[in-house]
């Protein structure tokens, strides 16, 4: 098809046939390169000088000669004189596309076809010149903010269902370029909406992005446009509508805001009829709906989505494109929480839609703030109805009026802490966050310059409220005194211009400011050399200029001369040390921090592991001792009790005065291993003191008192712990990032904590390091990892290398029993007589269909649960457990007397007989003692061999290398406890004095009544495969073998 360009035809605006106009407009846009599949032309500088068929174009790109004239009085017709000036200024020509042969050669068409347009049926790639032309065209159209009014019926999605103005066109920039090619000035129409749309356009204008072919971004669409979008790479394209996130998105969607992304609501319902899906769609994952409907409506893969749901969503999108949007707008506002929106203001807008005064009145701008409507929202500027304004004033206290979407943003602290302005999606102002109260603040509100942003990233920032609240001027170690008086010679250090130096008899001139030397040997000239290079030039074999190069006047080595010069300058300009606050003032400051209200963190301290290092293991020289009152378990070295010999009546330091409650001043965790400080009435956890660099212990053996509490920076006392979410005590920091948390909270939460032991210059240095949950995954069973020059020590490595205390051995040659068929259950009528019921004898030889534990209760058949029966035994007196015991022997004696009230035996779901709980047992409660005959290790080995020959199961528990408890023939019911890889009990070896130890089983978790009790046997994992004992616990983390 060839179209001559010499004749220009004026096209009249036909108001009757609107559909034909739309089709012709789209066709013209495609011909001019506005569409994705149109033809493109090469400029003259790429094809050479051809003097025929010069067609001028605006901004250096070709336009169609079929000029379009709008009948709207607001659009002026372009004069021919302006076109002639553009012809003179522009010397680019439009050429037909080059034709590529199959061999890759390029053929240039003859010059007689310069005034013709040949439609290319192939889809070739663009050249770089074409991309630059299209970018210039698109950027020019975007910067002009053109909005041409037309008579076409366009569908616009606004905040209310009944408001669908037809006089304002919301179209993409590519469609506008096809209509305003011949216009140099177009009127600017402010779009209706809030500040989100205006700031969005300004954001696009300030930061233009190079656009690729067929790639659309958030700046190409506006609120109400129908699009195709997908939420992920593996998700299908789904019809959606672009919404205004500030007014039409739910609060959860607004909180998960993603920069440079468009907020869309997908068509169709998810789950129920009242649920909608939302997403933030980035560039390249969003396309216009109408242009791509034929291509994307027949997607081959829907990635697990129901084709019926996709078809219903597509039908709803097509109805919305035709103007049926009432139900859609209702769903949008219902999901956004705008149920009480009054549409009277929008009806008034619709009546006055043609007035530009209304648009200037509604759209808020910086120049019109003093003329703000009294019913306009302070955050977005939207004018509220009288009824809505009265309601929002009643809900939100204060003088500022906020709409419902802006009021939602004030809850998650999306508001400036000084000017109280609402955070906007594309706010151009810079924000900083206070490290104390976590409130965002405009940098301009606190007079923070952009030059100091890098410094704020490395230091802590506090808002004016926190600075006034915590009185930071008392902290002398954090803030340098800028007003301190210097000495008389407070001028900067002035180095001498040059110094004569000597090396191996050769003189030279040293320039301290340049750190270079000019040799005076006579052959080098004025060339400046480095000290090491000049040293080699002089023939010195020392290879160390610091000692070989000397100053000629004083005969001092150059390095020593430089050090003396720096020391002299330091003494001359030494500042007068600032006056340090007194101990009384620092104590008052610390006590003021601790008087702030907080919620104490109540935790359950058990004897399973050390309360300081979290290790489970103990050794003969470093045993785990348990406080007789608070039941805190600590290592002797961790708590500083190496000289303690009587473990039966030992109490911790805090329990020596039980009438006074002790609490840690560095964290909100109650209880634990506490130690006194050098400040009276203040106590700290040993773990908290370890991870504060300013705190140390005066005595290494006793680990008390803790010194340096008053030297902790005050900024550490205003940090929010990410674990307990409280401001109390002093927080420590992750070694990889700026995450703050209490040391004890991190230890209880399973954070990775390490102790590094280094040796520098013959001196041992200890460094404590911790990691947040992002840089190291937390583990509830983690322990304090010790790194030394000889290696790394952790609980896992010791488990592999240390031979554990053996417990019970199970006979390995068990016979496999075939599973029997499921027995038929007979329904029982609870109101019938016992003699009328069917009696079915149970066969004990058959295996149960389901491996579950059955506790054995003596007393015959029972039709009621044990808890209900126990409530009827009012005559039975159950002795209450005393709150405290004078010694561990007394506690052990009470445990032996009452063990049958807590446990019983029964058929185990793991193996043979097992141990069960008669009642609920709390975490950390002592269950019973593992009793048996104590023999030497040699005797235990002989008995084990004899038991194997006789085919008996042996029950051996090793207390130490010399003593083993044999409960095979002599013992109590505790020997029936089975092994489990996920146990609910653990064993603790406790000393009762006179070098005698006992084994006590303690509940690891809360155990319910009738639940089987288990614990980990901790067999040696390094045994060969032929001695492996299979595990039958069937727990989720089963190790398959007990050793």
From Swiss-Prot:
It catalyses: L-lysyl-[histone] + S-adenosyl-L-methionine = N(6)-methyl-L-lysyl-[histone] + S-adenosyl-L-homocysteine + H(+). A zinc finger (C2HC pre-PHD-type) spans 661-695. Disulfide bonds: none annotated. It is found in: Nucleus. The keyword Transferase applies. The gene is ATX5. It is an enzyme of class 2 (transferase). A zinc finger (PHD-type) spans 719-776. It comes from Arabidopsis thaliana. This is Histone-lysine N-methyltransferase ATX5. The keyword Nucleus applies. One of its GO terms (cellular component) is plasmodesma.
């Amino acid at each position: 098809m060839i179209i001559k360009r010499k004749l220009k035809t004026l096209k009249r605006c036909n108001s009757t046939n609107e559909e034909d106009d739309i089709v012709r407009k789209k066709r013209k846009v495609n011909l001019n390169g506005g569409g994705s599949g149109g033809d493109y032309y090469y400029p003259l500088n790429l094809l050479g000088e051809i003097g025929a068929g010069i067609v001028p174009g605006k901004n250096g790109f070709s336009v169609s000669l079929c000029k379009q004239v709008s009948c709207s009085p607001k659009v002026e017709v372009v004069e021919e004189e302006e076109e002639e000036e553009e012809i003179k200024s522009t010397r680019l020509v439009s050429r037909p596309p080059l034709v590529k042969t199959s061999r890759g050669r390029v053929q240039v068409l003859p010059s007689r076809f310069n005034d013709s347009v040949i439609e290319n049926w192939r889809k070739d790639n663009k050249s770089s010149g074409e991309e630059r032309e299209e970018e210039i065209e698109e950027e020019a159209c975007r910067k002009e903010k053109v909005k041409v009014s037309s008579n076409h019926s366009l569908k616009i999605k606004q905040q209310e269902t009944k408001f669908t103005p037809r006089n304002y066109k919301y179209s993409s920039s590519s469609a506008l370029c096809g209509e305003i090619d011949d216009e140099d000035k177009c009127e600017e129409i402010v779009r209706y909406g809030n500040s989100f749309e205006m700031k969005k356009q300004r954001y696009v204008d300030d930061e233009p992005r190079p656009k690729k072919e067929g790639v659309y971004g958030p700046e190409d669409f506006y609120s109400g446009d129908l699009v195709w979008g997908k939420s992920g790479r593996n998700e299908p394209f789904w019809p959606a509508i672009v919404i205004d996130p500030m007014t039409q998105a739910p609060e959860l969607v607004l909180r998960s805001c993603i920069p440079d992304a468009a907020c869309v609501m997908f068509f169709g319902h998810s789950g129920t009829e009242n649920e909608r899906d939302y997403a933030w769609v980035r560039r390249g994952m969003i396309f216009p709906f109408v242009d791509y409907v034929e291509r994307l409506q027949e997607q081959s893969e829907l990635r697990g989505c129901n084709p019926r749901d996709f078809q219903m969503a597509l039908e709803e999108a097509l109805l919305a494109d035709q103007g049926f949007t009432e139900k859609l707008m209702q769903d949008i506002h219902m999901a956004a929480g705008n149920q009480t929106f009054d549409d009277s203001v929008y009806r008034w807008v619709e009546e006055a839609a043609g007035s530009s005064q209304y648009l200037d009145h509604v759209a808020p701008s910086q120049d019109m703030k003093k003329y703000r409507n009294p019913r306009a929202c302070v955050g977005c500027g939207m004018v509220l109805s009288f009824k809505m304004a009265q309601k929002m004033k009643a809900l939100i206290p204060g003088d500022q009026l906020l709409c419902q979407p802006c009021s939602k943003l004030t809850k998650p602290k999306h508001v400036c802490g000084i000017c109280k302005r609402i955070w906007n999606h594309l706010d151009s102002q810079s924000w900083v966050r206070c490290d104390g109260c976590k409130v965002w603040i405009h940098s301009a509100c606190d007079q923070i310059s952009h030059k100091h942003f890098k410094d704020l990233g490395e230091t802590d920032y506090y808002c004016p409220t926190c600075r006034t609240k915590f009185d930071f001027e008392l902290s002398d170690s954090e803030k340098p005194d800028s007003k301190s008086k210097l000495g008389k010679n407070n001028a900067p250090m002035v180095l001498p211009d040059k110094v004569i130096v000597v090396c191996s008899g050769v003189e030279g001139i040293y320039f301290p400011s340049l750190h270079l030397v000019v040799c005076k040997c006579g052959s080098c000239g004025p060339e400046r050399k480095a000290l090491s290079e000049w040293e080699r030039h002089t023939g010195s074999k020392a290879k160390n200029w610091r000692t070989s190069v000397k100053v000629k006047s004083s005969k001092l080595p150059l390095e020593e001369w430089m050090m003396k010069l720096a020391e002299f300058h330091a003494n001359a300009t030494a500042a007068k040390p600032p006056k340090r606050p007194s101990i009384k003032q620092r104590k008052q400051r610390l006590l003021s921090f601790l008087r702030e209200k907080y919620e104490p963190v109540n935790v359950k301290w058990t004897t399973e592991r050390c309360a300081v290092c979290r290790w489970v293991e103990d050794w003969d020289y470093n045993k785990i001792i348990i406080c007789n009152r608070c039941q805190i378990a600590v290592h002797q070295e961790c708590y500083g009790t190496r000289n303690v010999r009587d473990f039966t009546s030992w109490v911790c330091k805090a329990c020596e005065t039980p009438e006074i409650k002790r609490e840690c001043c560095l964290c909100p965790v109650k209880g634990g291993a506490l130690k006194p400080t050098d400040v009276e009435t203040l106590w700290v956890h040993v773990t908290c003191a370890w991870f504060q660099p300013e705190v140390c212990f005066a005595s290494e053996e006793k680990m008390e008192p803790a010194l340096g509490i008053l030297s902790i920076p005050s900024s550490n006392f205003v940090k929010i712990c990410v674990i307990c979410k409280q401001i109390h005590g002093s927080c420590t920091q992750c070694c990889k990032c700026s995450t703050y948390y209490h040391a004890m909270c991190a230890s209880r939460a399973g954070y990775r904590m390490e102790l590094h032991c280094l040796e520098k210059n013959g001196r041992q240095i200890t460094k404590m390091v911790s990691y947040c949950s992002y840089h190291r995954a937390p583990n509830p069973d983690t322990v304090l990892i010790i790194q030394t020059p000889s290696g790394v020590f952790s609980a896992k490595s010791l488990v592999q290398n240390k031979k554990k205390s053996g417990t019970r051995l199970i006979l390995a040659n068990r016979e496999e029993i075939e599973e029997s068929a499921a027995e038929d259950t007979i329904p029982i009528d609870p109101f019938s007589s016992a003699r009328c019921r069917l009696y079915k004898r149970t066969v004990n030889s058959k295996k149960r269909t389901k491996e579950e534990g059955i506790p054995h209760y003596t007393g015959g058949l029972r039709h009621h649960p044990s808890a209900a029966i126990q409530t009827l035994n009012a005559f039975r007196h159950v002795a209450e457990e005393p709150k405290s015991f004078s010694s561990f022997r007394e506690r052990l004696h009470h445990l032996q007397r009452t063990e049958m009230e807590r446990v019983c035996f029964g058929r185990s779901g793991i193996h043979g007989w097992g141990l069960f709980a008669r009642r609920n047992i709390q975490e950390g409660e002592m269950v019973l003692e593992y009793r048996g005959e104590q023999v030497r290790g040699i005797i235990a080995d002989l008995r084990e061999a004899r038991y194997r020959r006789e085919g008996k199961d042996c029950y051996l528990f090793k207390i130490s290398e010399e003593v083993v408890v044999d409960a095979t023939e002599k013992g109590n019911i505790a020997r029936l406890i089975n092994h489990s890889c996920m146990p609910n009990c653990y064993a603790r070896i406790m000393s009762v004095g006179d070098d005698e130890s006992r084994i006590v089983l303690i509940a690891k978790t809360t155990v319910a009544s009738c639940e089987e009790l288990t614990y980990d046997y901790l067999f040696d994992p390094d045994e060969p495969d032929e001695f492996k004992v299979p595990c039958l616990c069937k727990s989720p983390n089963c190790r398959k073998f007990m050793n």
